[in-house]
Curated annotation (Swiss-Prot):
It is found in: Host cytoplasm; Host nucleus. This is Non-structural protein 1. InterPro entries: NS1, uS15_NS1_RNA-bd_sf. It comes from Influenza B virus (strain B/Victoria/1987). It comes from the Viruses. The lineage of its organism: Viruses, Riboviria, Orthornavirae, Negarnaviricota, Polyploviricotina.
Amino acid sequence: MADNMTTTQIEVGPGATNATINFEAGILECYERLSWQRALDYPGQDRLNRLKRKLESRIKTHNKSEPESKRMSLEERKAIGVKMMKVLLFMNPSAGIEGFEPYCMKNSSNSNCPNCNWADYPPTPGKYLDDIEEEPENVDDPTEIVLRDMNNKDARQKIKEEVNTQKEGKFRLTIKRDIRNVLSLRVLVNGTFIKHPNGYKSLSTLDRLNAYDQSGRLVAKLVATDDLTVEDEEDGHRILNSLFERFNEGHSKPIRAAETAVGVLSQFGQEHRLSPEEGDN
């Protein structure tokens, strides 16, 4: 087991989570106002509806982890999100909210900088994907699956059989694809399973998925902390299935880690986390 392996993640605390949810709620408010003006086309209307469903689900999940005094409804978060937009767009702290201030307002020698060039803002230290190191989470009875010299269909079936033996709760799964003693793929997954009364098992939380290429280089990663998790059971089931499907190409050609990563990251719309070079590997 790769207990001594160093991996990478973005660390997102509860403050950033609240800010993100509130900002997206503000975006939803803008979408709705545009819709009321009959200025939203059909694709835009579809995005509005999907964003609203996702936000309602995410707020419900997030509120469970918050003390009752800090729980907020979607409508309350919309109001805060609109104020955040005013701060971001106009750099006007008087339009803002407590605890949220643009980076330049806190760090510029000139507090009145409405013409700041956003491209000049330095990044927040340590928040790049490759800047924060993390050890794999320790989980009781971690599972390692070695897929050696078998076709992709058999490999996929073995993964499904192994995963179905996982107990409810947190899990760590390491998948190694080995063809003719060449390690062509390694995937490390951390998450949480929920088992339903009918025996159906769904992935409720996907905390991390790391994909490594033939040389052991980490080519892509999807990491969530705090309550940034799979937003509903359907998402979790689809994401896990997308991982399985990468092993079902119908031939014995080694599967590249980048292809696997693209397949999984695309479920979150996170393909941009791969550079073009990594995506082509």
